[in-house]
Amino acid sequence: MARLQDTLSSDQATRDAAEQYLAHETLPKSGTDDVLGVQLAQILSEASLSLFVRQAAAIALKKYVRKRWSIFFDTFTQDMVVNGIVQTVDATPVEAKEHIRTSLLACLCDAEPKVRSQASDILSLISSCDFPDHFPQLLPTLQGYLHSYTEQDAHAAYKVHGAMKFLLDLVHVELDENQLLMVAQQLVPLLQGIVSSSSDWITPHTRARCINVFHQCLISLYMAKDTYVDTVHMVTTHYLPPWLQGMQVLMSPDFFNSANWQEPVTWEMLGLRHEIVAFLGTASHFRNIFQEYAPTLLRLVIAQLQAMVPLFIECHMLDNISFPSSVEADADVACSVSM
C-alpha cells in the first residue's frame, strides 16, 4: 500500500523509487511465492481506499498480468537470473488467478466509473487467454449483471455499465471462433432486450452502449467472415434481423419535433441516433440480410439528417446552442451534431 501511495508523491525521487520497486515485484520470484497480484486486485476492489491508490493498483496489476499471467502473452517473463543462474518459473498459480478474476468481476459493478473501466481493461486481457476453458464463470456473471436492470437492484446501473464496458473491451480483442460464438449466443439477445425495453430506467446512453457492443461484434464478424464462414453466417442470420427491426423504431423522426435542447436527455437521444447510424454502416456490409431493411432505414437516416440541419446551424454557425460536455463514463456514446 505504501509503495502505491508513493507513486503519487510530488517528489520525483520517491515516485521513481516506488515505480522501480513495483516493476521489480512484478517479475517472477518462484512458482509458489505469488501474492502480489492478489494483493493488487484486493486494493483495486476496496471502495474505502483513495481512488488514486486504487488506480495505481490497477496500473501495477495490468503490468503484473502481462508479465506473470500466462505464456499466452508475448510479454510473459518466464526466465529470471538468480546469482548469475538462469531459472525458469511458472505462470501465476491457478488459485491466485481465481482470486484475481473474482475481484475484477466485482470491480465491474463498482460505484466509481474509473475503477470499472480499469478493471474491464485488465479483465479483457485475462479473458483473451482464459475464456472459456479456465474462466467458466465469466458469461454467467455478465448475464447476471445485464439482467439486473429488470430487478430492483440499487447497483443495476453500475452492473450494466460495467458489463457492457467489458464486452466492448473484449470484442476488441481478437477472439477465436468458439469465443465469438459464445459471446453472440449468450449475450447479444440480452443486449437486444435492453435496447427494446420500455423500462424508464434504461437511459438513451445505456441503449446506445448496447448498440455499440453489438456494432463491435459485427465488425469482428465481418473481419472473420472468410475464416469462420459458418459461424458468421449463423450469427448474422439469426441475430441481425431483430436488431435492424429495432433500429427502425428507435430512428423515428418524431423525436426532432419535440426536442428540447436544454435537456441533457435530449442530447443523449441524439447520441443514440448517432450510434445507430454508425451501426447501420457496418450492418450494410452483410448485404443479403440488410437489403430487406435498407429502403426503410435509408429513408429514416435521410429524414434525420434533414431534421438536424437547423440544429447544426444553431450549434456550429450561429453558436446559439451550447454543445454539452459528456462525463468520462459516457464518452464512448457521446452525441455529435456533425454525424
Residue positions per predicted region:
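N-terminal "cap/leader" segments of large eukaryotic alpha-helical scaffolds
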Residues: 1-48, 151
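Acidic, Ser/Thr-rich intrinsically disordered and amphipathic helical segments
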Residues: 2, 17-20, 35, 39, ...
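Residue-level detector of extended alpha-helical repeat arrays and alpha-solenoid scaffolds
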Residues: 14-15, 54, 97, 116, ...
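Hydrophobic residues within the alpha-helices of tandem HEAT/HEAT-like
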Residues: 22-27, 57-68, 122-130, 163-174, ...
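Short inter-helical turns and helix N-cap capping residues of alpha-solenoid HEAT/ARM repeat scaffolds
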Residues: 10-11, 48-50, 111-112, 150-156, ...
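Eukaryotic helix-linker segments that join adjacent hydrophobic helices
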Residues: 48-110, 114-117, 121
